[in-house]
Structure formats: structure tokens, C-alpha cells
UniProtKB/Swiss-Prot annotation:
Its cofactor is Mg(2+). It comes from Kocuria rhizophila (strain ATCC 9341 / DSM 348 / NBRC 103217 / DC2201). It catalyses: 1-(5-phospho-beta-D-ribosyl)-ATP + diphosphate = 5-phospho-alpha-D-ribose 1-diphosphate + ATP. This is ATP phosphoribosyltransferase. Keywords: Amino-acid biosynthesis, ATP-binding, Cytoplasm, Glycosyltransferase, Histidine biosynthesis, Magnesium, Metal-binding, Nucleotide-binding, Transferase.
Length: 281
């Protein structure tokens, strides 16, 4: 049975559980459940601290896990990225009091608080900056006011929390992060991984694309199919009246209205859009 680690709290947890549910896997109904066995799909899910997941997977205790790239790299675990999951996007940034710092070089001899000690120390070494790293488990934005640090390094999504604490981001992002499916890099592919990966890829496609249908005259078809080429070409079916066809094609969800406008301009009519519930590409 495939053994998979899932974050047990926070935004990573909610989005991971939603994605696994959309992929057809049973998920826990209560935060008190630590383990859930999905016998129908041959998967055992373990709900763990996001920061610990890479360690369990890298150590071979569990086959797979869902965690952030930031947590994976900071852990130093022997686990590798298997699939990007397109949620929990963030950046690892430096921040400090307004107007005090402009680059990482300004941190020479300073104290920097972070929950990501490995990532920060690696970055400082690469930049040739000698600074004291103060490791905290959370709420690092309060460390400057409390006199523990001069600056911080933290994962940022919107930056609202930092601004509320009177801090500003400076210098370039240290790294970008998002949610990942990970596995131990030097192990053979575990049984069941290919199905899980294919299902998650199907969820990503279903979230990113819609199905677009429209009617058009045959002589106008080349211009229309140039707008909607689909993945491997559109599906074209004759209609009941001479010279008209129905076209079906996958379109990126973000481009829906722009594509509909372009189709209308070249003569397409009865343009309809339907969501994709699941996909295998």
C-alpha cells in the first residue's frame, strides 16, 4: 500500500486535501485523525507537520509527501521533487525596518531571525555576508521589535503581515516556492505512484482548462481553429445544415473571454464554455 504524507495544518493542508479529494482519494473529516486508509485506492495517508514531511520521505519511512519547496530544501532531506502542484506559491525574502536596509550586503555583522536556517545560511555564504542567524519556529516578524534580531528572512505570499509589523522587503528573492509532491530520490518508483501522479496531473489540467464549443461556417474554420488549436487539434463535427460545423476544443481558463471574443470576430456563434471535472492527458 502506498504511504503518503499530507500536511496536517495551515494553507498547505487545506489545498492538499482539496486536491487529493478532487483526484478521487478519501481524506480525513476531522483534524484529530492522524492516519486514514483508503483501501479502494490502495493508499495510506499520514497527516504530519509540513516541516517534518521531507524528513519522513527522505528517510524512506514514507513513499511520498506533499510539502513546500522551501521546507524541502531547508530540511536537507534526501527527497526529490516529483510534481509541482501549482498552489502555495511564495517567495523567501529578506525584510527589515523601513528604510534601514537595501541589500543583503547591508546585513554584514547583523542578526537575522528566520525559521529557515539552512536556506538563509546558504544564501549568506553565497553572498559573502557574515551575519548571525537566529533560528525561531515562527512569528519571526516580531523578533525585531523584541530586540532579538535586526532583520528577518521569511516566506512571503502577499507581504501583508510584514507591512502590518512595520517591515519592508528588500533585495531580490532568495528563492521561490510552491507545493510539491516529493519522493525519495534514489529509490525505485513505488507501486501506485504512477496512478497518483496521473490523477494529480489530471486535476491540474481540469483547473487550468475549460472546454469550449462553438458553431461556424466551414470556410471560416481555418481562422477559428488557429484561435483554438486545442491540445492535439480540435474536434470538428458536421451540423445538420450545409456548410456548418461544430467545434470543440480545450482552452486555457485564464484566456476564456479573450478567446470567445476572438472567435466571435471571425464568425463563430453559439459559443459555450463548460468546466472540466477531471482529465487524463
Amino acid at each position: 500500500m502506498l504511504r503518503v504524507a499530507v500536511p496536517n495544518k495551515g494553507a498547505l493542508s487545506e489545498s492538499a486535501i482539496t486536491m487529493l479529494t478532487e483526484a478521487g482519494y478519501r481524506q480525513r473529516r476531522s483534524s484529530r485523525e492522524l492516519v486514514l486508509v483508503d483501501n479502494d485506492n490502495g493508499v495510506e495517508f499520514f497527516y504530519l507537520r509540513p516541516r517534518d514531511i521531507a524528513i519522513y520521505v527522505g528517510g524512506g519511512t514514507l513513499d511520498l509527501g506533499i510539502t513546500g519547496r522551501d521546507l524541502l530544501l531547508d530540511s536537507g532531506a534526501e527527497a526529490a521533487e516529483e510534481l509541482c502542484l501549482d498552489f502555495a506559491r511564495s517567495t523567501f525574502r529578506l525584510a527589515g525596518p523601513l528604510g534601514q536596509f537595501s541589500s543583503v550586503q547591508d546585513l554584514q555583522g547583523k542578526r537575522i531571525a528566520t525559521s529557515y536556517q539552512v536556506l538563509l545560511e546558504r544564501h549568506l555564504a553565497e553572498q559573502g555576508v557574515d551575519a548571525e542567524v537566529v533560528r525561531l519556529d515562527g512569528a519571526v516578524e516580531s523578533s525585531i521589535r523584541l530586540g532579538v534580531a535586526d532583520a528577518i528572512a521569511d516566506v512571503v505570499e502577499t507581504g501583508n503581515t510584514l507591512r502590518a509589523a512595520g517591515l519592508e522587503i528588500f533585495d531580490e528573492p532568495i528563492m521561490t516556492s510552491e507545493a510539491l509532491l516529493i519522493r525519495r530520490g534514489d529509490e525505485p518508483e513505488p507501486e501506485g505512484l504512477s496512478v497518483l501522479r496521473r490523477r494529480l496531473q489530471g486535476v491540474l489540467v481540469a483547473r487550468q482548462y475549460v472546454m469550449m464549443d462553438y458553431d461556424i461556417r466551414e470556410e471560416l474554420l481555418p481562422a477559428a481553429t488557429e484561435i483554438t488549436p486545442g491540445m492535439e487539434g480540435p474536434t470538428i463535427s458536421p451540423l445538420g445544415r450545409d456548410g456548418a460545423v461544430a467545434v470543440r476544443s480545450m482552452v486555457r481558463k485564464a484566456d476564456t473571454n479573450k478567446v470567445m471574443d476572438a472567435l466571435y470576430e471571425v464568425g463563430a456563434r453559439a459559443i459555450l464554455v463548460s468546466p472540466i471535472q477531471a482529465a487524463r492527458i
